[in-house]
């Protein structure tokens, strides 16, 4: 990275961080930073409970969250801004509150960019066992902790978002030594890596986005894991065999579309761990699960989001 870069930022609300980040990843922009003051305010103060170290995040008007993406000055920034605005309108149609939804662009020097996004990521403890750590940060682990090494600048899934945390917490609860796990929409690979670290025998990550596939593979290499396979494509089109757990951290509408295929991909009694579900979409998802032969065994809430765990029963 040399010279001048363009920072495109969206001022939004916490519940919209994931889909808005996805807009930028869809533009093949690997350099995305998230600032979420609610993530700080909802946790006890301490170095391992804050994802973002810089307290000035809290100074955003109305505790707004911000997604920032960094583009080369050679990119057509005006077109990017208009595209982002169009996608924000689509997100609103899904019933997700994007808050202010302001899109801004400004020039930044390379050095400013590097300091600006990396300073926000610090080690974060997700469960008693799991700590997510950026690859450039030092961290002294205890004997019980499992460390996920991650480059947060690659694809969505850093451990900062409620949906990611709840999925990892569910994996911590349900993964056993002989478990096979499929991670649908694997993004950065964080959930696949968590499953492997927690002792899963075999893990398959699947994503339609080639950028996400490459990001997952890169992050897996940082963690020296050899029992994770990452594939590009749709679940049943590219995956052979069946899983004991399928995890999907995506939006409710896509979960409903996937449910029938997931049922076919699960062993009898297998679990479907899902998140990315806002409160008013919970009934839609649980009704689809019942229709497809799943029994809901757990619904967890964190902020505006829900994590539903369902069991394949027939």
Swiss-Prot record:
Pfam families: PrmA. It catalyses: L-lysyl-[protein] + 3 S-adenosyl-L-methionine = N(6),N(6),N(6)-trimethyl-L-lysyl-[protein] + 3 S-adenosyl-L-homocysteine + 3 H(+). This is Ribosomal protein L11 methyltransferase. S-adenosyl-L-methionine binds at residues 164, 185, 207, 249. Its EC number is 2.1.1.-. GO terms for cellular component: cytoplasm. It is found in: Cytoplasm. Keywords: Cytoplasm, Methyltransferase, S-adenosyl-L-methionine, Transferase. GO terms for biological process: methylation. Belongs to the methyltransferase superfamily. PrmA family. Methylates ribosomal protein L11. One of its GO terms (molecular function) is protein-lysine N-methyltransferase activity. SUPFAM superfamilies: S-adenosyl-L-methionine-dependent methyltransferases. Its main location: cytoplasm.
